């Protein structure tokens, strides 16, 4: 593991705008893909007569390997710049990309948004159905504020390498992002040609009008978000083991606060209190754990039957909230008909998956302005954004997104698909007896 500070990166943008090619090029230029793999990809691309596609082939090769569960050279999805160590959380084009983006085990610290400068492609991405728009909205909803917009395929603009086309795209994308509340000081634009590596890790000679930083230099300008150590402790439980001679060992990732040996903690929704006897991360004993740490911890006073995946451990003084009902801003991504009161999808919130009933649709939101477009609509359909109240069918820990982001965002699943995504604005707590 690198000693450099670590950032999680997500790569977003419309289909075919060159996300895979860009990441492939970046990883290769930084020496994180070996020559042999590059040669194989080059040959595969030549056979199909698509020489410029070799970097995308690299990414596809990786994806196949990942989906088959074979881990070839996983440094593939990790790379270093001069300043940082990056993990690409999710490469694009993945089936569950949107769901992963929301319930992703790790919150992305920054995004690269890839936008094609090619006529027709750019416009398709920004159309009502376009993924450029959808991914911009999702990034903001998910609390990703640092974005590098890579305007790709500059060689395929009507006038190749045209500064006017670059400025036109910067202008419209900026307006759109601004309308969703992005702080434009944290959004940077760079013109690139991914297959040739122009402005990826080296300055392009073909666009002398651009004298800003390369993509790699922009990655080094990103900021590391502060760890929420001062917030109350929250650990969504992923698994629970019972180890002979040790006892009960819940496993999870600390989302906020600090856990120390000797601490008294409470598991919700059961309301069971235990004392931390030991903490381990990657088979190493530690005395305290902080946000971002994946840990196993042994607890005295708790039995295996008391704790399960989806529960949340927290501080006794400020226990995790069990929701009687909660209000969320939801975006419907897909639904064959419409969503109305009574609809009960399964909500994936942190590590929990619980059926929740729509008890009220308060308002439909105009996605362009973020303002109310209709009060108490009867139903909402794909593409709509709305304020919705949910009633969990079983006990569920849920928090406000602005207080605990990882416990306040969710994906709605039904019929094997992601129906929508949302962030929790308000929670009506249920009283739980702590024992």
Curated annotation (Swiss-Prot):
Any single GO molecular-function term of the entry would be:
translation elongation factor activity
G3, as annotated region:
90-93
User: Which residues does Mg(2+) bind?
Assistant: 20
Sequence segments annotated as region (G4): 152-155
| Entry-linked SUPFAM superfamilies | EF-Tu/eEF-1alpha/eIF2-gamma C-terminal domain, P-loop containing nucleoside triphosphate hydrolases, Translation proteins
Spans annotated as G1? 13-20
Please give the catalytic activity noted in the UniProt record: GTP + H2O = GDP + phosphate + H(+)
Superkingdom, taxonomy of origin: Archaea
Region of interest (G2), residue spans = 69-73
tr-type G domain: which residues?
A: 4-229
List, alphabetically, the Gene3D superfamilies matched.
P-loop containing nucleotide triphosphate hydrolases (3.40.50.300), Translation factors (2.40.30.10)
The subcellular localization recorded is: Cytoplasm
Its top-level enzyme class, in one word, is hydrolase
Disulfide pairings: none
Keyword entries, A-Z: Cytoplasm, Elongation factor, GTP-binding, Hydrolase, Magnesium, Metal-binding, Nucleotide-binding, Protein biosynthesis
Query: Which positions are annotated as binding GTP?
Result: 13-20, 90-94, 152-155
Name one cellular component (GO) term. Answer: cytoplasm
On whether Cytoplasm is a keyword of this UniProt record, the answer is yes
- Region feature (G5): 193-195
What job does this protein perform?
A: GTP hydrolase that promotes the GTP-dependent binding of aminoacyl-tRNA to the A-site of ribosomes during protein biosynthesis.
Matching HAMAP family = EF_Tu_A (MF_00118_A)
Protein family membership: Belongs to the TRAFAC class translation factor GTPase superfamily. Classic translation factor GTPase family. EF-Tu/EF-1A subfamily.
**Could you identify this protein by its name?**
Elongation factor 1-alpha
Instruction: Give the gene name.
Output: tuf
